[in-house]
């Protein structure tokens, strides 16, 4: 699998604190190894638009689509509680 980052994702990533960026980088490596890795807690977020959600940490999530052999990163944001 490969990774593609949308412009919207890059803007969100740039706004995230450095410790969140570092945690995200670790999580995306796990995603590349195994979509079902337990610490990602990846799940289908929006069935109609084929959007997935995965966990960065307790307070942050990232969103992506799977297009062929590519994970398209859409956003990384604080998790609304």
Model-predicted segments: where are they?
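Context-gated lysine
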Residues: 22, 27, 43-44, 81
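Enriched for short, Lys/Arg-rich terminal
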Residues: 2-7, 11, 15-22, 53-81
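A short beta-strand-loop micro-motif that forms or neighbors metal/cofactor-
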Residues: 25-30, 76
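A short, surface-exposed loop/turn module that caps and links secondary-structure elements
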Residues: 29-54
């Amino acid at each position: 699998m490969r990774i593609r980052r949308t412009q919207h994702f890059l803007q969100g990533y740039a706004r995230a604190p450095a410790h969140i960026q570092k945690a995200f980088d670790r999580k995306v490596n796990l995603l590349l190894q195994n979509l079902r890795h337990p610490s990602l807690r990846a799940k289908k977020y929006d069935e109609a638009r084929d959007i997935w959600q995965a966990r960065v940490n307790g307070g942050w999530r990232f969103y992506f689509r799977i297009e062929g052999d590519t994970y398209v990163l859409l956003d990384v944001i604080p998790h609304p509680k």
